[in-house]
Amino acid sequence: MILLGAVVACAAGIAVGRHVARHVGRHGRGAATGQGERGGILIGDTAAYDAMSRLFFGSLFGPIAADVAAVAEEVAPDGARVLEVGCGPGHLSIRLARRHGLDTTGLDLDPAMIGRARANAEGAGEGFGRLPPGRLPSFLMGDVASMPFGDGSFDVVVSTLSMHHWADPAAGLAEIDRVLRPGGRTLVWDFRRGFLPFHGRMPDPVGHTRGTPLRLVGATPWRWPWGFSLIQRIELVRASG
């Protein structure tokens, strides 16, 4: 059953990816800094990215949310504030709020994605249902290198499939360290550099992660082949100091 679900999600993701690839081919690439582009997909094509995220990566968010919730309970048992960096259309933040009751904030550079995330959280997005007003995640536009939050604002910072897009990983991780309270935790899930063609123009995060408590996980909890190897994770954690 799990294998079948993965195959179906993969096929759906490929179909959406083909549509988006045609869109990119017609309209060109985004800025070199990563603005206007998310992994070769124009962020302006918000509906296509939302569909791809839901279908291709949706099965990952359940285990990831459970892991984040466990860490949140460990570091702040009386109630944790969680920040998702690079939230996109908000699927993980919504799950953290709905299933785990966490006070969650999502940050993304693209205003269209923030609009999509807010709509999804309010129940306009297919399949989410409605959240009580007090449990709605907050979604804000901002750059990981200069976040609109005070020092020590969050107990847990999580990022999924975002770090390889950051124009300046060192600046981003320094900001995460700033907004993370003492004793807080950072969790990162990502593809290893070089797995996908567009990774060749992305900065390598290894060596640029000093200054924050960092836990780097593979692309999924199941350690699929495109996740970071154990050696790569050790190197990145060592580089983070």
Question: Which residues fall in each region the model found?
Answer:
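A short acidic, Gly/Pro-enriched loop at the edge of an enzyme's catalytic core
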Residues: 145-156
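Class I SAM-dependent methyltransferase SAM/SAH-binding core
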Residues: 83, 89-146
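A short glycine-rich, Lys/Arg-flanked "PGG" loop and its adjoining helix->strand segment in the class I
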Residues: 170-182
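Short alpha-helix
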Residues: 199-213
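A short SAM/SAH-binding and catalytic strip from SAM-dependent methyltransferases
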Residues: 156-167
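Conserved beta-strand signature within the Rossmann-like core of class I S-adenosyl-L-methionine
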Residues: 184-190
